[in-house]
């Protein structure tokens, strides 16, 4: 029975193991060895917008295999079929998508071309728009009963990749209220149907027997939202949860190592150098700073070994990057003679001020006089973008919703980039980014991206330090949970609690 209830957010935040047992697993008869077991999932962030897919909550629906998009991305970031089985570019501005036949929404209604038009039109006209549509003008129309045509204002080779964003999920008509509110309850197409949203405390999903694809192995998912990192770790340690997001490094010594799984993230901890003002206007001085950086010390001491040394802007979460990367010519460093620099970062991510301390020591050892500036992000971003610091440490996502790094590179390193902390304006970099942006997704575009990365790194405007990992907790009995760097998949149709295996 459909049940929409709202319960206060504090119910699942207590760290005591007895209370956690009640939070994650309501009292019920003891399970037999052969009984199907529901997956108990502890997530980091509670819903921010009532699980509307037009917000970041869409990624939760995707991670639960509840709401689906027309296409999905493979490990290389290329589009693959989902609710659309094929697509073609008709001309520079039009794309045709053929829809999968026989797809049933969780309320029993049939997915049609009009269903797709309704869902995507809601996203196109939403305020604010989903991130993936920022700066993108497009329209959609049905072509008969089995296809849709998307028309863009300008040529856009990444339309299929854009449509993979969880914020562009296709939902049943019942999800869309006249006032613009989108309610995903019993409205998706995925392997699990969402039946309960209990405010910011929990959610419940059941297996959907009418699913068009592989039927779910597990009978359902019981989701608890647990922002307290120690409470999430305790839930895994005590067997109160089967699957846990974002384990804190500080709790790892208390947890069986078999339950801990590291997932590389498309996020690079980067030192940006101001190329317009101050000591780092000189490329040779930037090269001196790059030569002073000791990445291994940061990985070992700040991240306790649970990060990857950066060889470029793009890390192991984009597995194609390393094999394409070529050695680049190095700028000869100049001698450092007591130049004073201001090194800044923000305190919202707890590890960054510690990174700043180590970098300050390394740069001081190279001859710089280093002043440090640490504030909350909201109070430092404007100054960073205005070029008021010589160096700035940032943990930066390198792919956005399209799964493609060109947008990140343009934003951070193009002359007209909107997030150009390094104040870089290099014609060779702009040329490389423009060329990469015009190429359709695939091997040729990936090669062009690496060439653009090489030109950026040659300027020493950015010194990539390390690539972050997230720690995912899985009980011994938890089988086939997805370890997805893009955080789009977690519980899949294959995910299951193995019979006869302990849950802790």
Give each language-model segment a name.
Residues 304-337, 347-354:
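Structural transition elements
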Residues 472-504:
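Long beta-strand-rich cores associated with HINT superfamily self-processing modules
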């Amino acid at each position: 029975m459909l049940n929409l209830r709202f319960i206060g957010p504090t119910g699942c935040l207590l760290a005591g193991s007895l209370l956690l047992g009640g939070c994650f697993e309501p009292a019920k008869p003891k399970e037999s060895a052969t009984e199907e077991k529901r997956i108990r999932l502890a997530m980091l962030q509670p819903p921010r917008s009532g699980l509307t897919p037009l917000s970041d909550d869409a990624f939760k629906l995707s991670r639960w295999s509840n709401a689906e998009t027309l296409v999905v991305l493979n490990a290389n970031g290329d589009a693959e079929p989902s609710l659309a089985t094929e697509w073609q570019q008709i001309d520079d501005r039009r794309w045709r998508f053929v829809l999968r036949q026989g797809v049933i929404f969780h309320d029993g209604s049939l997915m049609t071309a009009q269903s797709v038009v309704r869902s995507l039109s809601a996203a196109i006209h939403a305020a604010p728009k989903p991130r993936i549509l920022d700066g993108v003008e497009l329209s959609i129309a049905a072509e008969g009963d089995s296809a849709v045509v998307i028309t863009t204002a300008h040529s856009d080779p990444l339309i299929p990749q854009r449509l993979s964003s969880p914020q562009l999920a296709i939902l049943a008509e019942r999800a869309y209220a006249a006032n613009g509110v989108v309610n995903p309850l019993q409205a998706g197409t995925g392997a699990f149907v969402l039946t309960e949203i209990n405010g910011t405390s929990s959610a419940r999903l059941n297996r959907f027997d009418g699913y068009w694809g592989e039927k779910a192995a597990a009978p359902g998912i019981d989701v608890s939202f647990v922002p307290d990192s120690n409470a999430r770790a305790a839930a895994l340690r005590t067997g109160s949860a089967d699957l846990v997001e974002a384990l804190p490094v500080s709790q790892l010594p208390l947890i069986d190592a078999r339950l801990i799984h590291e997932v590389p993230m498309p996020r690079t901890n980067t030192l940006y150098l101001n190329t317009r003002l101050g000591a780092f206007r000189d490329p040779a001085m930037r090269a001196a700073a790059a030569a002073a950086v000791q990445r291994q010390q940061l990985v070992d001491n700040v991240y306790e070994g649970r990060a990857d040394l950066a060889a470029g802007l793009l890390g192991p979460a984009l597995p194609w990057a390393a094999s394409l990367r070529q050695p680049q010519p190095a700028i000869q460093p100049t001698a450092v003679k007591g130049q004073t620099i201001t090194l800044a970062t923000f305190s919202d991510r707890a590890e960054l001020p510690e990174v700043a301390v180590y970098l300050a020591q390394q740069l001081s050892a190279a001859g710089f006089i280093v002043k440090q500036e640490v504030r909350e992000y909201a109070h430092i971003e404007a100054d960073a973008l205005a070029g008021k610091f010589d160096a700035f440490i940032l943990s930066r996502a390198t792919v956005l919703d399209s799964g493609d790094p060109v947008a990140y590179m343009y934003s951070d390193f193009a002359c007209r980039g909107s997030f150009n902390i390094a104040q870089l304006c290099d014609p060779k970099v702009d040329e490389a980014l423009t060329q990469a942006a015009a190429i359709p997704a695939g091997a040729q575009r990936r090669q062009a991206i690496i060439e653009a990365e090489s030109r950026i790194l040659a300027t020493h405007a950015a010194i990539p330090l390390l690539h972050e990992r997230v720690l995912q907790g899985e009980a011994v009995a938890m089988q086939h949970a997805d370890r997805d760097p893009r955080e789009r998949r977690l519980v899949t149709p294959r995910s299951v609690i193995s019979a006869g295996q302990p849950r802790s």
